[in-house]
Design a protein with these regions (language model features):
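Forkhead-associated
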Residues: 135-208
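Intrinsically disordered, low-complexity acidic Ser/Thr-rich regulatory segments
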Residues: 1-3, 7-158, 168
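Edge beta-strands of extracellular beta-sandwich domains
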Residues: 210-216
């Protein structure tokens, strides 16, 4: 799966902007982004909730040192490339994506990538809004909704199973699946038998409690 065209354009613009010197004689930023994504794909962990990808990348480039400002800009864009690919492919990430560019010895055209899993807080990509109560934030992709203290989106209600349902983003959509809960998961009043697509404003019920689904 190739990078989205809009993301490719942003990476290509780095070559014409302040990062031009950084990429002179080196791997093109689009190629570098694809290299990171391949490394992430090779390092996937398959969890009970689905695939989890590494989120910390150290990229060693050969050649002459580059300005810190240009390096920072490239690191940000490469992180966005990994994040957007994770959403598109349905990968879970253990924390925010961090990319570090290190200029070392060796030919300028070489690049080496080390990938790691580093836990950290993630911003919410959706919220579950119950009537008259605080919202429940959905932060990681492939988030477990449930009563357990280990659930990603915790609902403290006896009618909710410890691991009740799964919420995630993939292939441009948002999805819900029941995890074999005791009281079932319902989408707009209909039981979720396997996997169902969720859109902004839908009504989700986990056992008894109901929530309006809002993407962030």
């Amino acid at each position: 799966m190739s990078l989205a065209r809009g993301l490719e354009r942003r990476l290509e613009q780095l070559v014409d902007g302040m990062a031009a010197r950084l990429f002179r004689g080196r791997m093109h930023p689009v190629e570098l982004a694809n290299l990171l994504i391949r490394e992430a794909d090779l390092a996937l962990h398959i969890l009970p909730v689905g695939p989890e990808a590494p989120n910390a990348f150290a990229v060693t480039l050969g050649g002459e040192p580059a300005e810190a400002e240009a390096r920072d800009a490239v690191e940000r864009e490469l992180a966005v490339a990994v994040e957007q690919t994770a959403w598109e492919r349905g990968w879970r990430l253990p924390g925010p994506v961090r990319v570090s560019l290190i200029v070392g010895s060796g030919p300028a055209a070489t690049a080496a990538v080390r990938a790691a899993f580093v836990a950290g807080p993630l911003p919410p990509w959706a919220r579950l809004l119950p009537p008259g109560r605080p919202p429940v934030e959905v932060c990681p992709n492939r988030a477990v909704v449930g009563r357990s203290s280990q659930a990603d989106a915790r609902i403290d209600d006896a009618e909710v199973s410890r691991r009740h349902a799964l919420l995630w983003r993939e292939a441009g959509g948002m999805w819900v699946a029941d995890l074999g809960s005791s009281n079932g998961t319902h989408l707009n009043g209909e039981p979720v038998a396997e996997v169902a697509e969720v859109v902004d404003g839908d009504l989700l019920a986990f056992g008894g409690p109901s929530f309006v689904f809002r993407s962030v």
